[in-house]
Amino acid sequence: MFKIKRQKSKASKLEWEEANDIRKHALEIVKTLDFSHINTQRLFFFRTSGSKSRAYARTWPFPKIFQRALGIEPAYVIEVLSEYFDKLDEDNQKKVLIHELLHIPKNFSGSLIPHIGRNRNLHRQANFFFEEYKKSKA
């Protein structure tokens, strides 16, 4: 009997591209919901394809140690994962963007707000702000 060697699947190629369409939607959300603590000049957007992650989107902070070492201001990157995010309808895409923007703290320090904390649930907050967003657009 022959033994069949299992071949490892080749890793898919991870690709990034600037996501100006996502930037436009996020800036509209920031303005509509008055998220004035967010410095939109230090907010960057990318669309990723080929990722193994099952998330719709992720928020990446620029770590404080790098900020100090390089002498630059805090910054955030919001990455949308094309395989999942692009399949969502427009309302759910906006809800995901609101969720990601809520990870950015009021002091825009380069840290992240976790999903659940004392007296806070980010998912509930995202749903609340999405409803507020929809009301203001009606």
Cite the ranges covered by each PLM segment.
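N-terminal low-structure segments adjacent to metalloprotease catalytic domains
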Residues: 1-21, 81
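Hydrophobic (often cysteine-bearing) scaffold residues that line and stabilize catalytic clefts
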Residues: 22, 93-94, 122
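Auxiliary, metal-adjacent structural segments of Zn-dependent hydrolase domains
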Residues: 24-70
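Active-site-adjacent structural patch at catalytic or cofactor/ligand-binding sites
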Residues: 63, 77-82
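Short, flexible turn/loop "capping" segments at secondary-structure junctions
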Residues: 71-77
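Short pre-active-site segment immediately N-terminal to the catalytic Zn-binding motif
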Residues: 80-96
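Active-site recognition of the HExxH zinc-binding catalytic motif
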Residues: 93-107
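Post-HExxH zinc-binding segment in Zn-dependent metallohydrolases
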Residues: 108-138
